[in-house]
Amino acid sequence: MACGSSLDSIDMNSIPLVALNYTVRHRLCLYLNPDAVVAADWTRLAEEMGYDYLEIRNFQRYPDSTMKLLEDWEKKCFRATVGGLLEMLKKMERNDILTDLGPLIEADCMKYLEKKHVPLPIQDDKVDSSEQYRITKSDDPYGSMPETFDAFICYCAQDISFVQEMISRLEQTDYKLKLCVFDRDVLPGTCLWSITSELIENRCRKMVVIISDDYLDSSDCDFQTKFALSLGPGAREKRLIPVKYKPMKRPFPSILRFITVCDYTNPYTKAWFWDKLAKALAR
């Protein structure tokens, strides 16, 4: 995409898909809706977004499959950003779309950013601005674009080495997942419990619970796990992913026994561990 100089300093992955207006979406549909023998169409885009065969077949029922796909992805995925869409189109080698729609996309993004730079409402002196708007290091200071993550990592200090390996394996590889690691990402000086609750409930799609003997003694981990479990009985199995990365001397926590464990200690499945975990988080 031939980006204009006005957007050279903007991270397109920070701009949500809602920034794209109808004109861009309609033209994108004109490119992707027709069945193509050579060029990748909307079904390939759906695969890049993580949809499976049956879900893609379901989209075929709609007269405008591409438009329906974009709307569904926007609702379900926290990472539905303009940058994410552009990366997928580039991977599909649809340079024709990037070239043709580039100026329109840039214009929509600039309009979106301009709308966000509006004067803040008068704030109560009793409410600290960092507490009201900024929770994480990459949060928008004006509160218009809160930082979101693929997963909140529930861990105790003794297991930090495995957390660092998770960062290396899941963020710094082709998986390109975004993890919320409290000690790395959260700003100091805010209420611990309210910030943790906000992150788990509203900022993170999933929560990885790193289980160990030390985890069982952590009051912070206990609160985070029980809070996540309390959010919704129907969705908690999809939200919570327990990970066992080393042998334990004490019994596995009973409140997590009904959820499938991602077991790093099993020598027979260890080779598939990271790929399975990454796909579970991206789902």
UniProtKB/Swiss-Prot annotation:
Question: Keywords, A to Z?
Answer: Cytoplasm, Immunity, Inflammatory response, Innate immunity
Gene Ontology biological process = defense response to Gram-positive bacterium; inflammatory response; innate immune response; MyD88-dependent toll-like receptor signaling pathway; positive regulation of canonical NF-kappaB signal transduction; Toll signaling pathway; toll-like receptor 4 signaling pathway
Residues forming the TIR domain are 147-281
Region Intermediate domain, annotated ranges: 106-143
Q: Which GO terms describe its molecular function?
A: TIR domain binding; Toll-like receptor binding
Main location (coarse class): cytoplasm
GO annotation, cellular component aspect: cytoplasm; plasma membrane
- Whether Cytoplasm counts among this entry's keywords is yes
Superkingdom of this protein's organism: Eukaryota
Q: Where is the Death domain?
A: 27-105
Q: Extract the SUPFAM superfamilies matched here.
A: DEATH domain, Toll/Interleukin receptor TIR domain
What's one Pfam family the UniProt record gives for this protein?
A: TIR_2
- Cited Gene3D superfamilies: Death Domain, Fas, Toll/interleukin-1 receptor homology (TIR) domain
Q: Which PROSITE patterns match?
A: DEATH_DOMAIN (PS50017), TIR (PS50104)
Where does the record place it?
A: Cytoplasm
In the record's own words, the domains note is: The intermediate domain (ID) is required for the phosphorylation and activation of IRAK.
Write out the function statement from the record.
Adapter protein involved in the Toll-like receptor and IL-1 receptor signaling pathway in the innate immune response. Activates expression of target genes in the Spemann organizer region during early embryonic development. Is required for normal axis formation.
Q: What is this protein called?
A: Myeloid differentiation primary response protein MyD88-A
Which species expresses this protein natively?
Xenopus laevis (African clawed frog)
Output the lineage of the source organism.
Eukaryota, Metazoa, Chordata, Craniata, Vertebrata
Q: Name the gene behind this protein.
A: myd88-a
